[in-house]
A protein has these predicted regions:
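DNA-contacting interfaces and partner/effector-binding or oligomerization modules
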Residues: 1-7
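Short, Lys/Arg-enriched anionic-surface-contact patches
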Residues: 16-36
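Short Lys/Arg-enriched helix C-cap and helix-to-coil transition segments
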Residues: 77-93
Length: 106
């Protein structure tokens, strides 16, 4: 149900926060950020950026800048007049590589 989805989103957001702490604004971080943000937007979250900022432990302005960078570097497409966007092949590949690597969650 909805709680399950929300829990997954919160987990992903927290994981993004850990990546940011450990690696800075790295490829896995931007991919994770884009993916979590897209899920939030798809859920119809009214304020995905503040929610994301809370999970990551940074200010919304900072997270907004990171999302801009994620779009610029090709992790997330821009959809005019709509929150969210589509994840790109690059994002999928980076996340897959991360999850399958030693510092992933297995």
């Amino acid at each position: 149900g909805m709680e399950e989805v929300t829990a997954k989103v919160e987990e992903a957001g927290s994981a993004a926060g850990l990546l940011l702490t450990n690696e800075g604004v790295s490829e896995p971080y931007l991919a994770m950020l884009a993916s979590t943000y897209k899920t939030m937007a798809d859920l119809g979250a009214q304020a995905p950026v503040p929610w994301l900022a809370r999970l990551i432990g940074r200010r919304p302005e900072t997270v907004k800048d990171h999302l801009k960078r994620a779009r610029r570097e090709g992790y997330l497409t821009t959809v005019a007049g709509k929150a969210g966007g589509e994840l790109t092949e690059k994002t999928t590949q980076v996340l897959a590589a991360f999850v399958n690597s030693d510092d992933g969650w297995n």
